[in-house]
């Protein structure tokens, strides 16, 4: 990007010419060939608050953490269109062109009924009710924590791109060398960016922050986030991404209100300035704790405000990438707290037919989620001119490597060594080192893998999303049965001759 900047003589100089990022529509040609691809029913079940490790091996998880407040990041693998066996290959030239997929339709299906899941903490750092207090609270005791539960902020979110989404959160920063931090001082804060992975926690109403590093009590927020990082999508950063690969488009719906008002127990780190109040007497001589916090609530969930289970058609992406699936992959990020019901499961230890005894039963919590991903892909072609290949190489060299355009080394003119007895123990091993597999740039991140390499179909009318696409695009499916013409009568059949009219 070229910008005008002022010089020392307060004269604005013209910018230096630089290469510009262009839209994929300028070098990608779309065809009239469409495919449908859909996943199987995707299910996951676990504990809504924390993962359960194995008793004899804490590093092994026997029950994962599955919450309605987690991000679901699906990494959708697509087949290579350049290896497709098309019935008619006359629409492109494999010598000078390459094929890519463009996502033009998406539907995220959600099963399970609407419901509100709650969370809480058996030892929440709550001192007093500051909303409707009928007395002035005195000084806190040694331990004033209470068992409190609440519902969370309501969020529905769907992000689509060919790279993982970027999140933001507040974490502990590094102080300057001349600002020494002593125990008990408030640490400096820093806005950090990180990749949103499958299983990361969303903003629940307590802020997008690193609760592990910034809340040492482990009791200021509910159990499911007290030792986690709550991330919020960094829309500003993703929208400003030059090539537009991270975010094609997004759907978002958030709502929250505050249900209760409390304050914390503990010592106030930054006292209220004396010029903000007039000192009291008696029970008000000592100020109450001024560290207030609310309990969030997402309010009512309703089917009238759902963004899922409906198709979306992408005509124009928000960035320069207009839906082209570089690397034959897509990243679909989903959040849906409107189906966060936590199921209560009870198992009997001993039979108690006559009287109820709570110790005879064990109580468990489980949360289950159900997804279904459906796509419509359009086949596109790219003509490999020198300018286009140079531009793609500057954007992402791995794309050309996938198209078998890597650099080939010239033949060596030096003398090479060749041993006679290659299996002899008297010489060094002659086995060639195996070729290293291509390194996955996202191997260090956790995603929900969805393989659609064998799920493509050109029969769009055989799938619900395909029929919706044909209807809105004005296409008609090819008829499966041809209505034949009525057969002509046989030659032996004769028609009676008409009687000639005569005048009298």
Curated annotation (Swiss-Prot):
Keyword rRNA-binding: no
A GO molecular-function descriptor: structural molecule activity
Signal peptide start-end: none
Protein's GO biological process: endocytosis involved in viral entry into host cell; virion attachment to host cell
Localization terms from the record: Virion; Host nucleus
InterPro entries: Capsid_L1_Papillomavir (IPR002210), Capsid_L1_sf_Papillomavir (IPR036973), dsDNA_vir_gr_I_capsid (IPR011222)
Region: Disordered, residue numbers: 480-504
A Pfam family recorded for this sequence: Late_protein_L1
Alphabetical UniProt keywords: Capsid protein, Disulfide bond, Host nucleus, Host-virus interaction, Late protein, T=7 icosahedral capsid protein, Viral attachment to host cell, Viral penetration into host cytoplasm, Virion, Virus endocytosis by host, Virus entry into host cell
TM region positions: none
Principal subcellular localisation of the protein: virion
One annotated Gene Ontology cellular component of this protein: host cell nucleus
Subunit structure: Self-assembles into homopentamers. The capsid has an icosahedral symmetry and consists of 72 capsomers, with each capsomer being a pentamer of L1. Interacts with the minor capsid protein L2; this interaction is necessary for viral genome encapsidation. Interacts with protein E2; this interaction enhances E2-dependent replication and transcription activation.
Homology family: Belongs to the papillomaviridae L1 protein family.
Role noted for this protein: Forms an icosahedral capsid with a T=7 symmetry and a 50 nm diameter. The capsid is composed of 72 pentamers linked to each other by disulfide bonds and associated with L2 proteins. Binds to heparan sulfate proteoglycans on cell surface of basal layer keratinocytes to provide initial virion attachment. This binding mediates a conformational change in the virus capsid that facilitates efficient infection. The virion enters the host cell via endocytosis. During virus trafficking, L1 protein dissociates from the viral DNA and the genomic DNA is released to the host nucleus.
Name the record gives this protein: Major capsid protein L1
